[in-house]
Amino acid sequence: MQNRRLTALTLFLLLLSLLLPPLARAQNVNQQLAAGSVLETIKKRGALKVGMSTFVPWAMRDKNGELIGYEIDVAKRLAEDMGVKAEFVPTAWDGIIPALLTGKFDLIIGGLSITPERNLTVNFTAPYANSGIQMVANKNLATGFKTLADFDKPEVVLAARRGATPATAAKRLIPKATLRQFDEDALALQEVLNGKAHAFVTSTPTPAFEALKHPDTLFLPMPEPFVQGAEGFALRKGDPDALNFFNNWILLRQQDGWLKERHDYWFKTRDWTDRAVE
């Protein structure tokens, strides 16, 4: 009996000695991952660096030169909940993902649509907003245009922001049209207002807002978006802790109604227009 007990104890100790190193190694790996998370960088710095680009009503300047918009509210609330301040890094849209990858900022909160191509390069959170792609057209140039087929002709000129999802959608769905791309939405819109392009392809709700703002010049050829999309925060790959935190933050702000309230204010009302620069 005593020999059997001794044998069992020996086997238990042997098994324990085999298990402890892997457990210790796993714990060490977890500690290293946590220490390497951008969350730790943000906390030590005391600031959340956010990459963004101006895009009404996501982000824009007010009459005092300060940034306002849906994304700005989201980033400020996120930083507040983390106990840090928000720092915004305005970036050209076609270079915003490369800038994230080189560490110019911690994440992108900038109306960035989730696409498979982008997701191969960066990680996306769950959607915190949903928008669509629509166009606003010049009344003189696009008289009678009501479908995508009406615009799908070589003599038709479309304007869009360079590198943005609407430009990609225009290439795919209206391939015969001539597409001109601009660094800013305002420049693309101006091309249509000046009668140099038939339509401006962009994300909702901009087309409807601009049609209301310029009723003598612009109209909505199609009342509904022709592509639906979803926007998420983008962050560098290999950071599961940060992805988990941001996903849960979005979930909680959806559950308490804060994201919807802010989204409705910026996307379904024009109460903010007096604050924005024309």
Regions found by a protein language model. Give the residues of each.
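Short helix-initiation/N-cap motifs at beta->coil->alpha
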Residues: 35, 72, 88-98, 143, ...
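Periplasmic-binding protein-like
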Residues: 130-137, 204, 208-251, 269-278
